[in-house]
């Protein structure tokens, strides 16, 4: 599944971390200062990102990238029928179905979230060919670490 993710996504990937993304951003800032160029950053943190993953869309995405139907079905069965309740000072509310989100603490959740987020970014038009900051012949317009995204560009 890592082959579906671009280099700009460092979240939950072996040998990658937040330090890499911070170093990339610092390097861009230093080069911009050195060459007296204006650059812009937009920092985005998706609130409750893991809880917002729509299951039906996730299964569609997995199918589109070529995940075998048997595996998608297995993942669907893991998520199906999940229920929750809320306990408060006066008791608990009725149980309700959970129709969104990837399981917190599940070893597959980070990978599933990354694939879901990548689909959103691709559909937002943030491909490498779009405007960004040219680094080694490539346009880099965003850096990501799981649900944290930094959009970048210059005037």
Language model feature labels by segment:
Residues 1-155:
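Nucleotidyl polymerases of mobile genetic elements and RNA viruses
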